[in-house]
Regions:
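Acidic, glycine-rich A-domain
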Residues: 21, 29, 49, 57-71, ...
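Acidic/polar low-complexity segments with low predicted structural confidence
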Residues: 1-66
Length: 245
């Protein structure tokens, strides 16, 4: 279930004759002056006295709110074609949109990687491409360090989704599994989406085979082969959370 924190809020619902200068209610003060002068038979706004002054007084109330941070991670290596990125972008867009409906506040962190990972802007996340090999664990490591430092689990519901074609350095697959198991101690949910475009190899990657050994109810995987699989991926990733049908 979603973690809730108690937030302090203020509402100015009352007016009093004494208060802080910065809380002076000019409109109510003018009305009091006008009312007093009319009762004296001297209508108009003039001759201000202390008894005319009205100040806004804050009422404090507390609200239980839910906050979420979403880590979206994408493989930037040369094998991630424009078509594969399009599928990843579509899933990411709807993930963020749904979570913004569920939570009071949602922050999104974009992480891109080839053999090394970095936090990037949304524009770069979807627009840039890099060459070279792929070391997916670099992204999971950056996300783990970042959430521990900036988004404590006592205050945030942390979601993480990673999209790759699974063409990972072979000896890194076990490291990925270990990093995900670490992240599951910090995250509300971790998801891995493997993108297999129509003309690429359709068999699941060695990375996905390694990740299938993670037996955890909050770790989900799916394979996307065409744009038509986007809805199925959303059901796999979000159905239990927000009733995607």
């Amino acid at each position: 279930s979603a973690k809730k924190i108690i937030s302090e809020h203020y509402q100015f619902t009352d007016r009093r004759r004494h208060g802080m200068p910065g809380n002076l209610d000019k409109r109510q003060t003018l009305l009091q002056n006008l009312k007093r002068n009319m009762l004296k038979g001297k209508p108009g706004v003039h001759d201000f006295k202390d008894e005319d002054l009205r100040y806004r007084v804050p009422d404090v109330y507390y609200e239980r709110t839910t906050n979420a941070v979403v880590y979206l991670m994408m493989d930037w290596s040369g094998s991630m074609t424009t078509q594969k990125k399009f599928i990843a972008k579509a899933v990411c867009f709807w993930i963020v949109r749904f979570l913004r409906l569920k939570y009071t506040a949602v922050e999104v962190v974009f992480i891109a990687h080839d053999t090394e990972a970095e936090i990037v802007s949304e524009q770069d996340f979807f627009g840039r491409s890099e060459g070279g090999g792929t070391r997916c664990s670099s992204a999971y490591t950056v996300a783990l360090q970042h959430t521990i430092q900036y988004y404590p689990t006592s205050l945030f519901n942390v979601y993480l989704w990673h999209f790759s074609d699974g063409d990972n350095i072979y000896d890194d697959n076990t490291v990925c599994k270990e990093r995900i198991e670490d992240l599951l101690r910090e995250c509300t949910m971790v998801g891995y989406g493997e993108i297999k475009w129509e003309h690429s190899a359709l068999a699941p990657s060695n990375l996905l085979h390694a990740l299938k050994n993670i037996n955890h109810p909050r770790f989900l995987t799916t394979i996307l082969r065409t744009k038509d699989d986007v809805h199925a991926a959303l059901k796999a990733f979000l159905g239990a959370e927000i009733g995607v049908v």
